[in-house]
């Protein structure tokens, strides 16, 4: 008996990465993930819950997540939704007034210093030496350490209120002046989160680079702390990775660097899902074919190494296609991978690109070991009906200039594999060995 849709949904639920992701994100970064997860329990047209219990569970989770922040109006609305009331308790109005007063107090405490930092004649006298800058501001403008620290405190307060652009600006101003390395490091993480939540991807990438450098230098003598901080950064970097195409290559370079590959394998192997998807989906956009092939080989290598530690339909598709060469299993896993992508916050928008690219890779691998391919069977394996399959394969052969032709009368694709004699293969391998020997000899001669 075929499995029901409900049992299939339940089996795929085990691949939900939300519980793993939230452990490595700030509460404000968790919120978009929770919000997206809760949307699946509501009707898109009526906005009425389709699953009342699940919808309430997600609302409760959002309330618990944000109740300690200063986002008082939103938290009050969540309370009303949970309790089924129109008016929140008086404590929320009291907290709102308290937050407004604190905002005004912070404004007053930093107004003098922020005004100074807006003046050209002051900025022109600042140098890269923070100690000298503080001495100049203290001597010429009566600026104190407490006033600088107030920028940091106000930035944190604005962040707690959900005013992310304001928080980013305050934390930047603090970082320009402060000599407190621990707070400067915390401010950089805070500014990174603020830029992510503001959707300022260029700014986020600048901060991500600073955080990465800080981890490498400041925590050099503490490998355990380095591993923990790199684990956090790996998760935070998923936001620009899937939201800013211009940042993708730089981030992939980071992910595939030895330090971060080691971090993923040691601490968070589930990140393999995101690496596999972004690499495969980038097949058509890759400017450098060599770099793309290397990234794909790296993904395959890590999937093979980490199979005992982590697997899901995405990594199982990669394993079936490139490690086991099991095309039936790859065919089975691709639609499952597509379903997993549709419920993953970071991968929802890239699902179609992934499936299309995965079909291309499936076709390429399949064609390498078959001389004549049945169109109907291949269409089924690609998850397409016969007409869609024929059209898709015709377009692929045309676009990639694949040396193949379609025999519509027989319903087959005929591959033109060039014959390569054993003699020719020996010559090619000997050439490669001779070249490597020359390189080694030259290296030894130096």
UniProtKB/Swiss-Prot annotation:
Its main location: cytoplasm. This is Eukaryotic translation initiation factor 3 subunit E. It comes from Pyricularia oryzae (strain 70-15 / ATCC MYA-4617 / FGSC 8958). Component of the eukaryotic translation initiation factor 3 (eIF-3) complex, which is involved in protein synthesis of a specialized repertoire of mRNAs and, together with other initiation factors, stimulates binding of mRNA and methionyl-tRNAi to the 40S ribosome. The eIF-3 complex specifically targets and initiates translation of a subset of mRNAs involved in cell proliferation. It is found in: Cytoplasm. One of its GO terms (molecular function) is translation initiation factor activity. The keyword RNA-binding does not apply. Residues 240-420 form the PCI domain. InterPro entries: eIF3e, eIF3e_N, PCI_dom, WH_DNA-bd_sf. The gene is INT6. PROSITE patterns: PCI. GO terms for cellular component: eukaryotic 43S preinitiation complex; eukaryotic 48S preinitiation complex; eukaryotic translation initiation factor 3 complex, eIF3e. Component of the eukaryotic translation initiation factor 3 (eIF-3) complex. CDD domains: eIF3E. GO terms for biological process: formation of cytoplasmic translation initiation complex. Keywords: Cytoplasm, Initiation factor, Protein biosynthesis. Belongs to the eIF-3 subunit E family.
């Amino acid at each position: 008996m075929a499995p029901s849709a409900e049992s299939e949904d339940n089996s795929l639920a085990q691949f939900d990465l939300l519980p793993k992701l939230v452990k490595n994100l700030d509460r404000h970064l968790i919120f978009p993930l929770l919000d997206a997860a809760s949307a699946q329990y509501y009707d898109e047209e009526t906005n009425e819950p389709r699953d009342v219990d699940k919808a309430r569970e997600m609302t409760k989770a959002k309330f618990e997540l944000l109740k300690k922040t200063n986002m008082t109006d939103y938290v009050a609305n969540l309370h009303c939704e949970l309790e089924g009331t129109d008016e929140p308790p008086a404590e929320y109005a009291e907290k709102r007034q308290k937050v407004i007063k604190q905002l005004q107090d912070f404004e007053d405490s930093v107004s003098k210093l922020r005004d100074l930092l807006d003046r050209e004649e002051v900025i022109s006298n600042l140098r890269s030496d923070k100690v000298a800058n503080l001495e100049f501001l203290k001597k010429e403008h009566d600026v104190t350490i407490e006033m600088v620290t107030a920028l940091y405190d106000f930035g944190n307060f604005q962040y707690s209120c959900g005013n992310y652009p304001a928080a980013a600006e305050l934390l930047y101003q603090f970082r320009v002046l402060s000599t407190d390395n621990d707070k400067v490091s915390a401010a950089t993480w805070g500014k990174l989160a603020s830029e992510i939540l503001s959707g300022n991807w260029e700014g986020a990438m600048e901060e991500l680079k600073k955080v990465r450098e800080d981890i490498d230098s400041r925590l050099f003598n503490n490998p355990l702390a380095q591993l923990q901080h790199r684990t956090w950064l790996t998760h935070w970097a998923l936001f620009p990775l899937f939201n800013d195409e211009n940042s993708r290559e730089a981030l992939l370079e980071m992910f595939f660097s030895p330090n971060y590959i080691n971090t993923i394998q040691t601490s968070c192997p589930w990140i393999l899902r995101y690496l596999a998807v972004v690499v495969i989906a980038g097949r058509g956009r890759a400017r450098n074919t060599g770099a793309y092939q290397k990234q794909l080989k790296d993904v395959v290598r890590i999937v093979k190494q980490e199979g005992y530690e982590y697997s899901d339909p995405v990594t199982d598709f990669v394993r079936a296609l490139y490690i086991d060469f099991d095309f039936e299993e790859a065919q089975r896993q691709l639609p499952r991978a597509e379903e997993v992508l549709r419920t993953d916050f970071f991968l929802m928008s890239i699902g179609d690109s992934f499936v299309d690219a995965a079909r291309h890779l499936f076709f390429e691998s399949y064609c390498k070991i078959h001389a004549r391919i049945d169109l109907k069977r291949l269409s089924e394996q690609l998850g397409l009906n016969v007409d869609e399959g024929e059209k898709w394969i015709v377009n692929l052969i045309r676009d990639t200039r694949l040396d193949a032709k379609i025999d519509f009368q027989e319903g087959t694709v005929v591959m033109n594999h060039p014959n390569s004699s054993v003699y020719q293969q020996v010559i090619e391998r000997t050439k490669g060995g001779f070249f490597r020997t020359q390189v080694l000899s030259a290296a030894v001669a130096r």
